């Protein structure tokens, strides 16, 4: 008896039917196949004529005829060309041997994770829970299928796998999105390829891009494909509807993820748990292996139609200085002949002409005196530049100086760059004027650690804190009086050079405090230049020492004889000093 039961288990299920194995003529009909060929080639009229001639019954109704003709893809069309391209690209690494039931291509992996159930693992006793819609009034409400499905989705902890024909219900999609983002549940969605645009329209309304979800994968599947002898193929639709939850529960039935099925249409939903879920697990993995990613052509059509333009990453422009501006400012501060860095200030209005100060940029006139003497001209101007930094009056508000050396006004954009004098390089300074208040900042040691300021005991620093706004001792001479392109250029600008006939009114150099400021400025400038030249001198000395050692390397370590040529004696110190002290005519 035991052997008899084993033999019965080995037989196919069709042979155990009371009616016996199915008749092959019932599974395949050559006449119907030829009728379908006539339908694809000649249309409904040719199909009807073939049925009358062969005395066949109408095995397709009117809706099915329209669906078959709508799903037909003839060779040379856009859809067929795209399918052939995708087929060829996916089979580049495959062999040329034909195996109908096997493939040497790797199926797509479930990259988001999958429950680890080995084949034949026990998943519990099979239980069935049926839901129908609409329900009776005494059962608690008419929307049983949708409520039961959403309850199952909210209880998921590991994975949710959906196979659906059409998906356009916003509430269910939000439940899936919440499971991905808040609970970290992996979501796989397989949709019918022909009904995918409805899903993308829903994503557009919700302002969600399916490709940007980290724990959600959306792919497309199709039904069976019928190939005609003429090359035309008919792609079937997907009518499978089930949702697999954590590998232990599955919800299946006639209910689709649409608003009409949730509110209007009559449908049913069956929730299965236990060992029967293993069959749905295997079916989903088979469908996922046959699935394809969302067509790039379809996504491009949505992008061309500006349906996903709101999802583009638009980063606000940063108001902070960029790296390029910071590097240019740093180079300007360390150069011997600096230039004022340009951060792109606002251009003055065209209707207002920017007034120019009649004196030179190297002038040491007090800005307060100039302001009172040209008050009428400065009322209509926004910003003016000067090469010297003056002390603000006590009743004016001072603005702190930023680390990058940019001095701004409280009501204006930055139009000037203040580069303080450092110990290794000379720099230029610029002041910013405003219409209402003078926004010059007091250069404290906490804000300008590298600034070369006057000593506390010097007379110039004592006069700079007084009510009469004097010129600060840290004012530098403009680059007009120096050789801007030379590293070792010497600026010897004396007080006599400033007595030009063009400015007899403003250059009163006979005052004591101006003489002290000029003397202190030239003293600081000479010290900085000496330190700068000393650094260059030391680097050149080191380079010459390295070069002199390289000439003796081959003789001592490589046993190389220099030969019979005469080596000229060269004083390396003189070579070094030639670059430092060029002769001036």
Curated annotation (Swiss-Prot):
The gene is Fam83d. It is found in: Cytoplasm; Cytoplasm, Cytoskeleton, Spindle; Cytoplasm, Cytoskeleton, Spindle pole. Through the degradation of FBXW7, may act indirectly on the expression and downstream signaling of MTOR, JUN and MYC. May play also a role in cell proliferation through activation of the ERK1/ERK2 signaling cascade. May also be important for proper chromosome congression and alignment during mitosis through its interaction with KIF22. Interacts with FBXW7; promotes FBXW7 degradation. May interact with RAF1. Interacts with KIF22; recruits KIF22 to mitotic spindle microtubules. Interacts (via C-terminus) with DYNLL1. Interacts with HMMR. Directly interacts (via DUF1669) with CSNK1A1 and CSNK1A1L. Belongs to the FAM83 family. One of its GO terms (cellular component) is intercellular bridge. The lineage of its organism: Eukaryota, Metazoa, Chordata, Craniata, Vertebrata. This is Protein FAM83D. GO terms for molecular function: kinesin binding; microtubule binding; protein kinase binding. Residues 425-441 have a biased composition (Polar residues).
């Amino acid at each position: 008896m035991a052997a008899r039961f084993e033999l019965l288990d080995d037989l196919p299920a069709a042979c155990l039917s009371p009616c016996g194995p199915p008749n092959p003529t019932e599974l395949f009909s050559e006449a119907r196949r030829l009728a379908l060929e006539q339908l694809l080639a000649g249309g409904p009229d040719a199909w009807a004529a073939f049925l009358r001639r062969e005395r066949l019954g109408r095995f397709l109704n009117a809706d099915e005829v329209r669906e078959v003709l709508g799903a037909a893809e003839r060779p040379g069309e856009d859809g067929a060309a795209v399918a052939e391209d995708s087929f060829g690209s996916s089979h580049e690494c495959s062999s040329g041997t034909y195996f109908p039931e096997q493939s040497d291509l790797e199926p797509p992996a479930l990259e988001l994770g999958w429950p680890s159930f080995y084949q034949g693992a026990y998943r519990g006793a099979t239980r069935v829970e049926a839901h129908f819609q609409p329900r009776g009034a005494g059962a608690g409400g008419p929307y049983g299928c949708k409520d039961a499905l959403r309850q199952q989705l909210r209880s998921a902890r590991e994975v949710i796998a959906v196979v659906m024909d059409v998906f356009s219900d916003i509430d269910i999609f939000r439940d899936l999105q919440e499971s991905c983002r808040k609970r970290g549940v992996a979501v796989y969605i397989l949709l019918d390829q022909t009904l995918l645009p409805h899903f993308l329209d829903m994503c557009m309304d919700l302002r969600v891009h399916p490709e940007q979800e980290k724990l959600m994968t959306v792919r497309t599947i199709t039904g069976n494909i019928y190939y005609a002898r003429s090359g035309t193929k008919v792609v079937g639709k997907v009518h499978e509807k089930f949702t697999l939850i954590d590998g232990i529960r599955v919800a299946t039935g006639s209910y689709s993820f649409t608003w009409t099925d949730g509110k209007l249409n009559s449908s049913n939903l069956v929730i299965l748990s236990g060992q029967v879920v293993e069959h749905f697990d295997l079916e989903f993995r088979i469908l996922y292996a046959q699935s394809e990613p969302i067509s790039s052509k379809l996504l491009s059509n949505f992008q061309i139609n500006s349906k996903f333009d709101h999802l583009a990453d638009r980063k606000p422009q940063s108001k902070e200085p960029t790296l390029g501006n910071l590097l240019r400012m740093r180079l300007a501060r360390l150069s011997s002949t600096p230039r004022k860095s340009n951060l792109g200030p606002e251009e003055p209005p065209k209707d207002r002409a920017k007034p120019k100060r009649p004196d030179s940029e190297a002038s040491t006139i007090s800005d307060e005196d100039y302001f009172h003497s040209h008050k009428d001209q400065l009322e209509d101007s926004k910003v003016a530049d000067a090469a010297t930094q003056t002390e603000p009056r006590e009743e004016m508000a001072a603005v702190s100086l930023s680390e990058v050396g940019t001095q701004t006004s409280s009501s204006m954009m930055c139009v000037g760059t203040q580069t303080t004098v450092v110990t290794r390089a000379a720099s230029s300074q610029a002041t910013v004027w405003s219409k209402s208040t003078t926004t010059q900042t007091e250069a404290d040691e906490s804000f300008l650690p590298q600034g070369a300021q006057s000593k506390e005991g010097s007379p110039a620093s004592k006069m700079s804190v007084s009510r009469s706004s004097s010129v600060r001792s840290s004012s530098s001479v403009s680059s007009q009086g120096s050789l801007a392109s030379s590293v070792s250029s010497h600026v010897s600008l004396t007080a006599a050079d400033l007595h030009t006939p063009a400015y007899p009114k403003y250059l009163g150099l006979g005052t004591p405090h101006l003489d002290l400021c000029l003397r202190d400025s030239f003293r600081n400038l000479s010290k900085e230049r000496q330190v700068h030249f000393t650094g260059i001198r030391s680097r050149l000395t080191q380079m010459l020492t390295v070069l002199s050692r390289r000439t003796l390397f081959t003789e001592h370590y490589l046993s190389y004889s220099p030969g019979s040529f005469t080596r000229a004696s060269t004083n390396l110190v003189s070579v070094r000093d030639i670059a430092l002290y060029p002769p001036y005519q």
